[in-house]
Amino acid sequence: MELKVETLDRRHALHTLFTHRVLVKGQDRQKNFVQLREWCWEMFGPGVERTLVWHAREDDKTLRYRWCWHIDPANESNLYLYFREETASAFFIRWCN
């Protein structure tokens, strides 16, 4: 499985909520993305599409999610997972060897 890990900073809109994002790459990226998303759901609880987090208000329950995902509509081969600090470590230990 080919993964590219990025640390989020001020260039990224959600850097105040999430610390890392992972781009799922490679020939089997769609299948791997679904597998990773299912694993995250089981390990960290429900997630949500990034767009919902992006447009959430401060009092919105959406901001409490520990992880989210994003499929880039401009390029559907860009499949991302976003993590808060506490979930990123567990993901990296399991998937980023």
Predicted regions and their residues:
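Short, compact, well-ordered microdomains
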Residues: 63-97
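The feature represents the first ordered module of a protein
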Residues: 1-73
